Amino acid sequence: LRVLVTGAGGRLGREVVARLAADGHRVRAQDRVDLPETLAEYTDEIVTGDLRDAELAAKAVRGMDAVVHAAAFPSPNAAAEDEVFTNNVESAYRVLTAAGRAGVGRIVNVSSLSALGLAWARGEPSPERVPVTEDHPYVGEDVYGLSKYVGELVAATVSRRWGATAVSLRFPFLGTGERLRHHLSRVHADPAFDRAGLWGWLDTRDAARAVSSTLIRPLAGHVSITVTAPDTTALLPTVELLRRYHPTTRIDAPLPGFDVPFATRRGRELLDFTPVHAWRTTEAT
């Protein structure tokens, strides 16, 4: 497939570009800044510029079979709040609607479990129930989570209007190597550090594999899919964590051992995807 990857210079974007090239796809990479030279070997073409520019967005999607939209500020602290929201939402709107108009058949919208509204909330909300499913209501108050929630609405709208298959992948904390080790060390020192993220995680390389799988699976319409590792970041059992940090949350299904409190069935069934990287049995590298 001919695939546009937006935000190609980001932490996930770089992994996605390399993964797609390894899987035989032809990659056009976009970012608002110059990309590292190390990405050149994986790309057929590079587009540099701001996706909020409608003409640039139209140019970026032209001739593509699929779009992977990973461009976004990655947290509410990455810029001023107004800039985080307007950049993330407008860039999603520009590139996804341009893809729809251009007849692009497959859209992978890189979303986040922040679209639930838990991860960055200052009021420390708890999920209504676990395992948290994709239809859990939005409970957020931060601009980043709101921007990802709205981005999923944009993807669904584009799918309905132009008939494209659009998949919003909800990722948790992503990391590998030193980034993952640092995150784990903070959680192990104090499990409350990851309370808002419900101790979910995924190796960045597995996230890229999930994106690649999404491009070729037989899907239709728009669907949001949670993609996480099967276990948590914590050393304490999941039920103990929930009782300590989310005592009002209803536990609707068994969560033995360190099982992640997110429903992952949709990802396994629709994407035929299972993470291969783990931190409990191997060194986090």
Write out the residue ranges for each language-model feature.
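Conserved Rossmann-fold NAD(P)-dependent oxidoreductase catalytic core, especially the SDR/UDP-sugar
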Residues: 94-141
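N-terminal Rossmann NAD(P)H-binding glycine-rich loop of SDR-like oxidoreductase domains
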Residues: 3-23
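Mid/C-terminal beta-alpha module of Rossmann-like enzyme folds, strongest
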Residues: 208-264, 269-270
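Alpha-helical substrate-binding/gating segment
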Residues: 174-192, 197-224
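NAD(P)H-binding glycine-rich loop region in Rossmannoid oxidoreductase-like domains
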Residues: 44-87
